[in-house]
């Protein structure tokens, strides 16, 4: 049984990236022992959905998340620390996969950036880790 499949999401949420990238995402997840369960039903087609990803406690979360996005071939927008995007090749790849750099040092910056991005979307998903950090926290940032 594959770790993830494009059949888990409706066609309207697919990014139609190269099959080699989809295969790479599935292979990374499978190799690391991860599997994506569930999916998104067709009734959500054309709607704006927010996917909450928690807990975010490791740098591996980003690697696994991008692998899942690739394996699903999902059109998912996700928020990431702006410093990750400053490296040319990594930044370009992260943007290609749906990443949006946000500067967490600006007061209210991440919230306004997320609101601005959600308003621009039409029938896509946004994934965010509400803790705002990889450290273990007792409650989410609001």
Q: Residue spans of the language-model regions?
A:
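Soluble catalytic domains of membrane acyltransferases
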Residues: 14, 31-142
């Amino acid at each position: 049984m594959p770790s993830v499949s494009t059949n888990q999401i409706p066609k309207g949420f697919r990014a139609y990236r190269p099959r080699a990238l989809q295969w790479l995402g599935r292979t990374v997840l499978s190799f690391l022992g991860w599997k994506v369960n569930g999916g998104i039903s067709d009734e959500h087609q054309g709607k704006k959905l927010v996917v909450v990803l928690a807990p975010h406690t490791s740098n591996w979360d980003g690697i696994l998340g991008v692998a899942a996005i690739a394996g699903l071939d999902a059109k998912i927008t996700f928020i990431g620390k702006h410093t990750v995007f400053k490296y040319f090749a990594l930044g370009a790849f992260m943007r290609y996969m749906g990443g949006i750099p946000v500067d967490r040092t600006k007061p209210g910056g991440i919230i306004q950036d997320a609101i601005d991005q959600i308003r621009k979307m039409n029938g896509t998903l946004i994934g965010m880790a509400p803790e705002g950090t990889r450290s273990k926290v007792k409650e989410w940032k609001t």
